[in-house]
Amino acid sequence: MWTPRIAVNHWLLVTTAIFGFLTFIWIPQASAECQTRSIYCYECDSWTDARCKDPFNYTALPRDQPPLMTCNGCCVKMVRHQRSPYEVVRRMMCTSQLQINLFMVDHVCMMESSGNGHMCFCEEDMCNSSKDLHTNGCQLHLITIAVAMSWLMGQLLSR
């Protein structure tokens, strides 16, 4: 007999399978690309280097711009508002300097839990220079959908 509980379980199984398949296809491709080729990333810290600011002065001589480094991972940009929204500390680097699993972070921007900062990852030459570094978004949408579905299923199954 087809009951609402069976329908919900069936829907959850199908949706989980689709989500798992999409995650299996999209995320490893992006991570593999990020790990297999070298790119150039800016490396600087605005706390100690005045050249590390948004936006960069692209008309300045190379010695007056933040240093570039060869990166065998993704570029990283961390921005943190210290004491006020106007006092911003920026740090740019390569993921090889962090203890981070690229499978989890590629094309992602993560907000600090306090809301005072964020960390973004990208995989093109000098991409961590951008003032408006944004995420690709497809993984964020999938994660949001998965969390919403989990909550909804929990609500439906608890009845």
UniProtKB/Swiss-Prot annotation:
Region (Loop 1): 54-67
Subcellular location: Cell membrane; Membrane raft
GO biological process, one term: rhythmic process
Keyword Signal: yes
Physiological role: Bifunctional regulator of neuronal activity in the mushroom body, and possibly other regions of the brain, that acts as a signaling molecule required for homeostatic regulation of sleep under normal conditions and after sleep deprivation. Reduces neuronal excitability by enhancing Sh/shaker K(+) channel activity; possibly by stabilizing Sh/shaker to increase protein levels, accelerating its activation kinetics, slowing C-type inactivation and enhancing recovery from inactivation. Specifically affects the A-type K(+) current.
Record remark on domains: Consists of a single Ly-6 domain, adopting a three finger fold stabilized by 5 disulfide bonds. The first loop contains a region essential for protein folding or that is required for localization to the cell surface. The second loop mediates protein-protein interactions.
Name used for this protein in its record: UPAR/Ly6 domain-containing protein qvr
Protein encoded by which gene: qvr
